[in-house]
């Protein structure tokens, strides 16, 4: 990927990076481990973003 990115693309990538987190521990504890994963988790090599 280019080192010089347009700002809009950079913001989209940053948002995707922030969304790509695990479920917080307090959620797992509060739901008695009923919620362990979230379906929108993305792996950088398997699933690419629309750019």
Curated annotation (Swiss-Prot):
Gene3D superfamilies: Ribosomal protein L39e. It comes from Pyrococcus horikoshii (strain ATCC 700860 / DSM 12428 / JCM 9974 / NBRC 100139 / OT-3). The gene is rpl39e. Disulfide bonds: none annotated. The keyword Cell wall biogenesis/degradation does not apply. This is Large ribosomal subunit protein eL39. Belongs to the eukaryotic ribosomal protein eL39 family. SUPFAM superfamilies: Ribosomal protein L39e (SSF48662). GO terms for molecular function: structural constituent of ribosome. The keyword Iron-sulfur does not apply. Keywords: Ribonucleoprotein, Ribosomal protein. It holds the Pfam family Ribosomal_L39. GO terms for biological process: translation. One of its GO terms (cellular component) is cytosolic large ribosomal subunit.
């Amino acid at each position: 990927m280019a080192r010089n990115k347009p700002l809009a693309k950079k913001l989209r990538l940053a948002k995707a990076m922030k969304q790509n987190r695990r479920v917080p521990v307090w959620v797992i504890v509060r739901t008695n481990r009923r919620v362990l994963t979230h379906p929108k988790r993305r792996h950088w090599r398997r699933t690419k973003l629309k750019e």
